[in-house]
Amino acid sequence: MAPGVARGPTPYWRLRLGGAALLLLLIPVAAAQEPPGAACSQNTNKTCEECLKNVSCLWCNTNKACLDYPVTSVLPPASLCKLSSARWGVCWVNFEALIITMSVVGGTLLLGIAICCCCCCRRKRSRKPDRSEEKAMREREERRIRQEERRAEMKTRHDEIRKKYGLFKEENPYARFENN
């Protein structure tokens, strides 16, 4: 199609075909996951991997129990399962290690961001003066130039007055006085 040529509205059958293709792509993805309503207790005394296929389940290593994750609290309570033996998401990381790792990574990221912000601000400040400093320097320079112009005008006016009244200073006021 040539550039600049307007296209008409999309035919209705194309919209239906696109919607059907999207639906066909999403069905296998939805079928692979266990529904969140499936009881986690069905996977008790099985493997950790089978339990954690459902994202709403928590695996307790001490008693090989698959439990519903307590969504009301961020961390599972100790009465449910100790943090050192609780697994969620992946089987090879317990909750204690996960919490410590996430804290260290989060703290490192925050510290890195803070350091980057400080360095950028310092570099920006040292690189060029800000607008108020530039304005103050410009005004100071303008005042100095006006003052020099006024001094030059005053000097010429004073010289004219001295010439008028014969008080003009000589080139060398300390010339030797000669009597002839």
From Swiss-Prot:
Molecular function, one GO term: p53 binding
Keywords: Coiled coil, Cytoplasm, Glycoprotein, Membrane, Nucleus, Phosphoprotein, Signal, Transmembrane, Transmembrane helix
Swiss-Prot/TrEMBL GO biological process terms: negative regulation of DNA damage response, signal transduction by p53 class mediator; negative regulation of intrinsic apoptotic signaling pathway by p53 class mediator; positive regulation of protein ubiquitination; protein import into nucleus
Cell compartment(s), UniProt: Membrane; Cytoplasm; Nucleus
Disulfide bonds: none
Cytoplasmic side: 118-180
Membrane topology designation: Single-pass type I membrane protein
Extracellular side of membrane: 33-96
Domain of life, source organism: Eukaryota
Glycosylated residues (UniProt): 45, 54
Transmembrane intervals: 97-117
Modification type Phosphotyrosine: residues: 174
Ranges where the record places region Disordered: 131-157
Induction: By transcription factor RUNX2.
Secretion signal, residue range per the UniProt entry: 1-32
Annotated Gene Ontology cellular component terms: cytoplasm; extracellular exosome; membrane; nucleoplasm; nucleus
Tissue specificity field: Ubiquitous.
Stretches assigned to the PSI domain: 39-92
Segments forming a coiled coil: 130-165
PANTHER family: PITUITARY TUMOR-TRANSFORMING GENE 1 PROTEIN-INTERACTING PROTEIN (PTHR15191:SF14), PROTEIN CBG20567 (PTHR15191)
Function: May facilitate PTTG1 nuclear translocation.
Subunit structure: Interacts with PTTG1.
Protein name: Pituitary tumor-transforming gene 1 protein-interacting protein
Annotated gene: PTTG1IP
